[in-house]
């Protein structure tokens, strides 16, 4: 118990950053404005607000002027909420909505500052080389390739519903000392009517944020998960026979872009004070690995089913006693890796078992040795991607391409750019699939949807439109995968583009999940 308390004392000092004055700095709103316009490949921000870039900048300047007025924060948010239900003019509705969005985004940027500074100093202290590569989502998969083939069981964990808002603010007080800023946080959480969109529904494996307060609620959710994972880090380190450096490296990555291992959990100390030392022997396993993204987590182990069951109920008890809410045990599923495929980060992952027979000759005797090898395999779930395209109105549920009417008012170059960017992003994100044939079906759907959208705009048929402008018009914006790979790999390498559809490539520059993958 003393060791746990000493572990917590290392990080007992609070953050001394006073954040509230930053709300009156113009550059904060400029950062929020840039983030809002560039946050989605679907240009959701521009479509939601109904403004172009120029008029949005004008609104930002108007907001900065109003922010100095008395009770401006309260009036702006209340106006935005009331205008949803009360008849107001079109301009007033979008103005209030835009102001509320900008304040929310700016507030989120400010509250992330102490955590970002802490993360940078942490990696400098640890002297972690190339830690920026750990920001990539794809960096998780080489880790799984190396580890999962030697493990037996995997637990699929759905992180439970978010806790009460006041508990989140109280936890945040351990990090931020600025009292006015914390009061403003309470105001945001209690006033926004779209708080329910932040909840994780039982039917979905990922959490859903409202379009208007996405960054704020993402920050709150990340902080909540950060709190959940702290005790797991501590117990895992104390119970491990082998102090592997890779464990710290890969578990630290998920605090916004990395996970920091220190946090105060004083409430839980009282609960586990009597049983803490007796608990450690339950979890002793040198081959246990944990990865998480969004509302899912995977805990894999070489141990027995009994060990995984004990970890399962440990998580349930921790959520119950520390966060004061009950988590159903059915949210954690234990499966044997050899007979199980799991969906994670847009890939359908499994262990392939390959058996090979080798004839061995010793003097006059010969015998056959059967060798069984396991390989971590990742493929693209084409059906789920088609479902995402259907939700985004690019095709029907059966995969038949349709036009995108909402984009028909854009210029031809903008339409081509949007479709081409989505297609290239999908190929880039799913470059780690061992079977890429399904991606070419997705590419066909997007290309034909683009052609139908252009034909709809010009009041023509697809065949007539392509005959008049030529099919090469679409080829220019849908870069073939082989062309991209030829730029990445020099000609002197043994990498053959002919077999590129079977090669798995992981990129270290992907720091956010693709929007279409996020919809599935």
UniProtKB/Swiss-Prot annotation:
A GO CC annotation recorded here is: chloroplast
The primary location reported for this protein is plastid
Any GO MF annotation of the entry: RNA binding
Taxonomy, superkingdom: Eukaryota
Keyword Chloroplast among record annotations: yes
**Where does the record place a coiled coil?**
none
Task: Note whether Chloroplast occurs among the keywords.
Answer: yes
| A family per Pfam | MatK_N
Q: What processes in GO biological process is this protein linked to?
A: mRNA processing; RNA splicing; tRNA processing
| Entry keyword set | Chloroplast, mRNA processing, Plastid, RNA-binding, tRNA processing
Q: Name its cellular compartments.
A: Plastid, Chloroplast
Biological role: Usually encoded in the trnK tRNA gene intron. Probably assists in splicing its own and other chloroplast group II introns.
Recorded family membership: Belongs to the intron maturase 2 family. MatK subfamily.
Which protein, by its recorded name, is this? Maturase K
User: The organism's lineage?
Assistant: Eukaryota, Viridiplantae, Streptophyta, Embryophyta, Tracheophyta
The encoding gene: matK
């Amino acid at each position: 118990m003393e060791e746990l308390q000493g572990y917590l004392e290392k990080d007992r000092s609070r953050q001394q950053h006073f954040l509230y004055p930053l709300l009156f700095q113009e550059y904060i709103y400029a950062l929020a404005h840039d983030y809002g316009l560039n946050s989605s490949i679907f240009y959701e921000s521009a479509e939601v607000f109904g403004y172009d870039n120029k008029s949005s900048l004008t609104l930002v300047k108007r907001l900065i002027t109003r922010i100095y007025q008395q009770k401006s924060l309260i009036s702006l948010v209340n106006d935005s909420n009331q205008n949803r239900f009360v008849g107001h003019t079109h301009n007033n509705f979008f103005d209030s909505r835009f102001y509320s969005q900008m304040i929310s985004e700016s507030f989120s940027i400010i509250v992330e500052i102490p955590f970002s500074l802490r993360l940078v100093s942490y990696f400098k202290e640890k002297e972690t080389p190339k830690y920026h590569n750990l920001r990539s989502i794809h960096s998780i998969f080489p880790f799984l390739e190396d580890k999962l083939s030697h493990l037996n069981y995997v637990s699929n964990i759905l992180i439970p519903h978010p806790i009460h808002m006041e508990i989140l603010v109280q936890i945040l007080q351990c990090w931020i000392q600025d009292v006015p800023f914390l009061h403003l946080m309470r105001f945001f959480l209690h006033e926004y009517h779209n708080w329910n969109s932040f909840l994780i529904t039982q039917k979905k494996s990922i959490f859903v944020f409202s379009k208007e307060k996405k960054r704020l609620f993402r920050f709150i959710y990340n902080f909540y998960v950060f709190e959940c994972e702290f005790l797991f880090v501590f117990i895992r380190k104390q119970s491990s026979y082998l102090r592997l450096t890779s464990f710290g490296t890969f578990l630290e990555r998920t605090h916004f872009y990395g996970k920091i291992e220190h946090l105060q959990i004083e409430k839980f100390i009282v609960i586990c004070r009597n049983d803490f030392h007796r608990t450690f022997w339950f979890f002793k396993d040198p081959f246990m690995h944990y990865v998480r993204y969004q509302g899912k987590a995977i805990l894999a182990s070489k141990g027995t089913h009994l060990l995984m069951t004990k970890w399962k109920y440990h998580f349930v008890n921790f959520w119950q006693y520390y966060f004061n809410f009950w988590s159903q045990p059915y949210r954690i599923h234990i499966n044997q890796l050899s007979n199980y495929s799991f969906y994670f980060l847009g890939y359908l992952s499994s262990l392939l078992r390959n058996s090979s027979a080798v004839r061995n000759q010793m003097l006059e005797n010969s015998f056959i040795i059967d060798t069984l090898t396991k390989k971590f395999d990742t493929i693209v779930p084409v059906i789920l991607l088609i479902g995402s395209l259907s939700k985004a109105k690019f095709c029907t549920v059966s995969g038949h391409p349709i036009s995108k009417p909402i984009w028909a008012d854009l210029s031809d170059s903008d339409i081509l750019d949007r479709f081409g960017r989505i297609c290239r992003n999908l190929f880039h994100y799913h470059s780690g699939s061992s079977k890429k044939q399904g991606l070419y079906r997705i590419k066909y759907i997007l290309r034909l949807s683009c052609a139908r959208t252009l034909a709809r705009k010009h009041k023509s048929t697809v065949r007539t439109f392509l005959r008049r402008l030529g099919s090469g018009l679409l080829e220019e914006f849908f870069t073939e995968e082989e062309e991209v790979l030829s730029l990445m790999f020099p000609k002197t390498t043994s990498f053959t583009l002919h077999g590129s559809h079977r090669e798995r490539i992981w990129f270290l520059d992907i720091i956010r999940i693709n929007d279409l993958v996020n919809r599935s």
